[in-house]
Regions:
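Polybasic/polar functional segments that serve as interface/processing modules
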Residues: 1-159
Length: 159
């Protein structure tokens, strides 16, 4: 049984567990030099792991096309100064929504769309020198929302 079946959602593709065996998955390890760097952020005298933006787009367009959504998130990541490592997007039926993620060297950007509600929920979590706010204009241009609700969370506050 598909994990989405109880929710009334049917996937066009098998789950990633069905598509890839453990032997086929790729694990990338960083070099020792990268491990030694401190990617925590300091802003207004507060040190933390990274900035997490929760972005709700209301009255948005272009929410059914995985290729368009992939390009939009890539443009947002690049504008924020992030390094894209990997992307994966999945198109659902019957409503046409898309869920996807870009794995970044600095964390991730993810999206879930509900085209039947003209709504998209986007998470942008970044550490280091990246500024997730710099990616917002690319998202506005790509999805042309009537309204944006934004919440900022500083993750992993240490001082």
């Amino acid at each position: 049984m598909n994990a989405l079946s109880p929710l009334g959602m049917v996937s066009e593709l098998p789950s990633s567990n069905q598509m890839q065996s453990d032997a086929e998955r790729t694990v990338v390890h960083n070099s020792d030099a990268e491990v030694q760097k401190d990617y925590f952020v300091e802003k207004d005298g507060v040190k933390f792991a990274g900035m997490h933006l929760l972005v709700d787009l209301w009255g948005a367009t272009n929410l059914c096309d995985p290729d368009h959504i992939d390009r939009a998130l890539r443009e947002a990541a690049e504008a924020a100064g992030a390094t894209i490592l990997h992307g994966h997007f999945h198109h659902f039926s019957p409503n046409g929504g898309v869920s996807g993620v870009l794995v970044l060297a600095e964390s991730h950007i993810s999206i879930h769309t509900w085209p039947e509600r003209d709504f998209a929920a986007i998470d942008i979590f970044m550490c280091g020198a990246c500024d997730p706010y710099d990616g917002i204009p690319a998202l506005k241009a790509a999805f042309q929302p009537e309204r944006i609700d934004l919440d900022e969370q500083r993750r992993g506050i240490v001082a």
